[in-house]
Amino acid sequence: MKAIYDLPAPAKLNLFLHITGRREDGYHLLQSVFMLIDWCDTLHVELRSDGQLSREDLTTELPPDDLVLRAARALQAHAAPGQGAHIGIAKQVPAQAGMGGGSSDAATCLLALNRLWGLDLPLSRLAEIGVQLGADVPFFLGGRNAWVEGIGEKIRPVDIPSARFVVAKPPQGLDTKLIFSAPDLQRATPVAIISGFAADSEQLEAPNPESSAFKVFDFGHNDLQPVAQRLCPAVTDAIEWLGAQGLKARMTGSGSSVFAKMPQGPQEAELAKAPPGWQVRQCSNLAVHPLWGWAT
């Protein structure tokens, strides 16, 4: 195999994000549901026989040593001498959005190079490599929507009803470290239980699926959102812009993107014109990652 093209790296939304405590080492304890959506970056990998790693930015210019190159370098330690790769990245998922774009790119890179180089490393080993790159990388490697706990290391797959969403990303970004270090961050939300999320098979087969879907997508809140709104008023602007169209929005991750579930109906809904510089997209959620099963 000399190349693999058109490899998707899907973004995620946090349906809720609770901070339930803080460890002595400073890491925050969280609970969240990570949901894959069809807003994707695209990677292309080509085999190099000189042992070199190179990257080509096909859309947005990326930092010289981004997560993709770091992922490739970490995996290359398991490759045969002389195995290298040229990696092309077409970015579509915005940065500083709370959508996991960089982590998803790293996960897709690991899955792709594991196959390109014929390494056949198991998913558990890839996850060990991935967690050193970022806490969200193992989720994307796992390939399923998930209930996430601890500092992000406890991942349990969950089923989520199919739904459509509108995601709005204002041009301003947010520094995750600033949010987590804020003195007014809520760090004591009571621990929830997965059954309270109501995303089990019995709920999915309920007579009124819209009712059960509402429970799933309206569960909990995002503890990071009040701090983010204080630091970045554009988050509030985005929530209010969606609210003016009858959509109940909340922030994903540490922002600055916000999202809202769309009512059942046509594939594409008519939305008001977004302010200049905003990225707005209507998305569907995914049951599994497009590369699910590439490592087991």
Swiss-Prot record:
Q: Name one Pfam family in it.
A: GHMP_kinases_C
Q: Which GO terms describe its biological process?
A: isopentenyl diphosphate biosynthetic process, methylerythritol 4-phosphate pathway; terpenoid biosynthetic process
* Active-site residues from the entry: K12, D136
Q: Which UniProt keywords apply?
A: ATP-binding, Isoprene biosynthesis, Kinase, Nucleotide-binding, Transferase
Q: Carries keyword Cell membrane?
A: no
> InterPro entries from the entry?
GHMP_kinase_C_dom, GHMP_kinase_C_sf, GHMP_kinase_N_dom, IspE, Ribosomal_Su5_D2-typ_SF, Ribsml_uS5_D2-typ_fold_subgr
Disulfide links within the chain: none
**What is the documented function of this protein?**
Catalyzes the phosphorylation of the position 2 hydroxy group of 4-diphosphocytidyl-2C-methyl-D-erythritol.
Q: Which superkingdom does the taxonomy of this entry point to?
A: Bacteria
Organism from which the protein derives: Variovorax paradoxus (strain S110)
Q: What is its EC number?
A: 2.7.1.148
The chain's coiled-coil residues are none
Give the binding site residues for ATP: P94, A95, Q96, A97, G98, M99, G100, G101, G102, S103, S104
Output one GO MF annotation.
Answer: ATP binding
> Gene name, please?
ispE
| Family the entry assigns | Belongs to the GHMP kinase family. IspE subfamily.
Q: What reaction gets catalysed by this protein?
A: 4-CDP-2-C-methyl-D-erythritol + ATP = 4-CDP-2-C-methyl-D-erythritol 2-phosphate + ADP + H(+)
This protein's pathway: Isoprenoid biosynthesis; isopentenyl diphosphate biosynthesis via DXP pathway; isopentenyl diphosphate from 1-deoxy-D-xylulose 5-phosphate: step 3/6
Q: What class of enzyme is it?
A: transferase
Please identify the protein, giving its name as recorded.
4-diphosphocytidyl-2-C-methyl-D-erythritol kinase
